[in-house]
């Protein structure tokens, strides 16, 4: 039997009694955000909305975005990436489990020097798939010219944020390239590999 979303006690400032709120609501108040599924328009919009709202509330507190995602849609991913660059607080990105495809794109989009992978995390990069719309097969056809533009956009971001030469990134994106946490660090996708001594990160 599913247990639903766990609830935890939380006392709002000025309140005497704690109220039970769902755990994600509580974590969001601490600027802890989660991408733990395929990236689609819904989850992208939720994360964008949270970042914008919480930035209005307090522009000085950093975000911590935990990523365990097989990837997803390119356009929602680019929208989330752009929002991460737009909001005033720094966005720490933390890979736990897998950051593949657009998941790795979001990972590399964290504030430089504040991107981390857990020791046993995996990262995968590749070129964008041939369809980026959420639609029935055949309803939309991605023209080769548009796909090329998207690939150039993603490649340019990886080059800028990893410090790797264009030819290296382009070659890596020709196929699925899986990286360990330390390999992702060597590639410039993350800056740190976490260990047991980093429990006070957040």
Swiss-Prot record:
SUPFAM superfamilies noted in UniProt: ClpP/crotonase
Cellular location(s): Plastid, Chloroplast stroma
UniProt cross-references to Gene3D superfamilies, sorted A to Z: 2-enoyl-CoA Hydratase, Chain A, domain 1
Keyword Chloroplast in record: yes
GO molecular-function terms, A-Z: ATP-dependent peptidase activity; ATPase binding; serine-type endopeptidase activity
Any one Pfam family match given in the protein's UniProt record, by short name: CLP_protease
CDD domains linked to this entry: S14_ClpP_2
Catalytic residues, chain numbering: 101, 126
UniProt xrefs under InterPro entries: ClpP, ClpP/crotonase-like_dom_sf, ClpP/TepA, ClpP_His_AS, ClpP_Ser_AS
Role of this protein: Cleaves peptides in various proteins in a process that requires ATP hydrolysis. Has a chymotrypsin-like activity. Plays a major role in the degradation of misfolded proteins.
Assembly and binders: Component of the chloroplastic Clp protease core complex.
Protein name per Swiss-Prot or TrEMBL: ATP-dependent Clp protease proteolytic subunit
Gene: clpP
